[in-house]
Amino acid sequence: MNQAIHVNSKNLSGPGHWSDMDMMEVGNPGMTVTEQASHFAIWAMFKSTLMISTSIPAANSDTVAILQNRDLIAISQDEAGLPVSLVQRFTNDRDVYAGDLANGDKAVLLLDLSNITR
């Protein structure tokens, strides 16, 4: 996931043209609930297709809650179709991304990419 967010997709997506950051891993083994929520937020903010790759009938309540986040789904489906872009790197593992939405609002994504629980 860390490599996927460093790809500059700003000029690769827009209305009718969407990024493809590959499969979403939400609900699959290998990530904590917090990591899964971050993963979903990254896919939504970068306007990648939100293609679910886990078994819906087997999904637990945390997975369902993440996949039903209406605010992130709305950002993903915003008609401007513009992904967020890096606006500030505070250290090697903390980034701030922002992007414009069709209604004039800004979508902001704060990421801590370290492997340390804070």
What are these regions, as identified by a protein language model?
Residues 43-46, 51-53, 89-118:
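Carbohydrate-binding surface patches
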Residues 15-17, 28, 82, 100, ...:
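Intrinsically disordered, low-complexity regions
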Residues 38-90:
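Catalytic cores of secreted or luminal carbohydrate-active enzymes
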Residues 6-7, 25, 33-34, 56, ...:
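Short amphipathic alpha-helical surface micro-motifs
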Residues 1-55:
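Glycan-recognition surfaces
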Residues 1, 10, 15-16, 22-24, ...:
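Extracellular low-complexity, O-glycosylation-prone Ser/Thr/Pro/Gly-rich "stalks"
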